[in-house]
């Protein structure tokens, strides 16, 4: 048993006979009243996402999860195929199980796959960032800075990201998988 205040993104717990995956977990302190945990949760089986508020002291049963490294290969319709990087076994995961993570799946990306004790796939955990190419955006503005208002850019997977005004089509960018936000140009050296 673990208290709700200790729940973090990616954790899986059991509630009312269902496996629930934490998509987001935020501490919230309203002006009046006690602190609450506001969470986005996904039913592992159905893929349904709900927003739930819990008291920090509420307890839930964590589910033991086995992680295996796997490489994304391809998709056919709503089924996505991954290959275990150690055993070369292939696994299919439904679009419902993946949810919004689909927008970050690039060919050959390596993810962690989550399995229950009875070897059922629960879902995947993405790396913290991915590199993607800008497929469509307005032309870049010369002399623009990162501090500008930004503009929307459609990435090669269909993900829409707010990027600085100086970004052009065809550029490779580093995108955070937590919020889908622009981090930097790929291959740029930190200053």
Curated annotation (Swiss-Prot):
GO terms (molecular function) for this protein are: translation elongation factor activity
Which Pfam families does this UniProt record tie to the protein? EFP (PF01132), EFP_N (PF08207), Elong-fact-P_C (PF09285)
Q: Which keywords does the record carry?
A: Cytoplasm, Elongation factor, Protein biosynthesis
Protein name (record): Elongation factor P 1
GO CC entries? cytoplasm
Q: What is its main location?
A: cytoplasm
Q: Does the keyword Protein biosynthesis apply?
A: yes
Q: In which pathway does it act?
A: Protein biosynthesis; polypeptide chain elongation
List, alphabetically, the InterPro entries matched.
Elong-fact-P_C, NA-bd_OB-fold, Rib_uL2_dom2, Transl_elong_fac_P/YeiP, Transl_elong_KOW-like, Transl_elong_P/YeiP_cen, Transl_elong_P/YeiP_CS, Transl_elongation_fac_P
Q: Give the similarity note.
A: Belongs to the elongation factor P family.
SUPFAM superfamilies, A to Z: Nucleic acid-binding proteins, Translation proteins SH3-like domain
List where in the cell it is found: Cytoplasm
Enumerate the Gene Ontology biological process terms: peptide biosynthetic process
The protein's job, in short, is: Involved in peptide bond synthesis. Stimulates efficient translation and peptide-bond synthesis on native or reconstituted 70S ribosomes in vitro. Probably functions indirectly by altering the affinity of the ribosome for aminoacyl-tRNA, thus increasing their reactivity as acceptors for peptidyl transferase.
């Amino acid at each position: 048993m673990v208290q709700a205040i200790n729940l973090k993104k990616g954790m899986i717990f059991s509630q009312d006979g269902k496996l629930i995956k934490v998509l987001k977990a935020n501490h919230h302190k309203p002006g009046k009243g006690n602190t609450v945990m506001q969470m986005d949760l996904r039913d592992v089986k159905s893929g349904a996402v709900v927003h739930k508020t819990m008291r920090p002291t509420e307890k839930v049963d964590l589910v033991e999860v086995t992680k295996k490294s796997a490489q994304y290969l391809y998709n056919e319709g709503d089924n996505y195929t991954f290959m275990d990087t150690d055993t070369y076994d292939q696994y299919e995961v439904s679009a419902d199980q993946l949810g919004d993570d689909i927008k970050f799946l690039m060919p050959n990306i390596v993810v962690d796959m989550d399995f229950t004790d009875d070897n059922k796939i629960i879902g995947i955990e993405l790396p913290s960032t991915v590199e993607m190419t800008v497929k469509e955006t307005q032309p870049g503005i010369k002399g623009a800075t990162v501090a500008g208002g930004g503009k929307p850019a459609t990435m090669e997977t269909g993900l829409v990201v707010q990027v600085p005004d100086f970004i052009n089509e065809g550029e490779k960018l580093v995108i955070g998988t937590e919020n889908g936000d622009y981090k930097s140009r790929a291959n740029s050296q930190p200053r």
